[in-house]
Amino acid sequence: MNVYSNVLDMVGQTPMLEVTHIDTGPCRLFLKLELMNPGGSIKDRIGISMIEEAEKRGDISPGDTIVEATAGNTGLGLALVAAQKGYGLVIVLPDKMSQEKIFNLRAMGAEVILTRSDVGRGHPEYYQDLGKRVAEERGAYFINQFGNPDNPLAHEMGTAPEIVEQMGGDLD
């Protein structure tokens, strides 16, 4: 059993499972169990990537505040990383999010701002537009998962090579 001193070291190297009890036709089907990441999803990987790449560029340093607009697990991945690295985190969420997700974000140290879920892009209360505005008003870093090239970089540099290694290079 591995013993870790930092929860971020536990992100990645998630197991692969071959599906054998349902008909997969002529194919062998494998599942990558990203739920085994400490935050419970693949979004832990992008949280690390987006924050660490911003650090490398000098865009942020511990003590700064990061803002993100999210309707999914990205907020939890960012909260995990921000808490470990000493960043403030503000998450802007549509009001339809579950109370459990909101509770978890707050428990991980994030400030949660709820906004309307019944409006679209261009409306002042649309979650992505509001997230950008909150970052500007607070002088914080808007991480912008939807337009951030460090989001897919997590998979180009981490997830994909990990799959190739776990499969012994035998992919089609």
Regions found by a protein language model. Give the residues of each.
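PLP-dependent amino-acid enzyme catalytic core
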Residues: 1-172
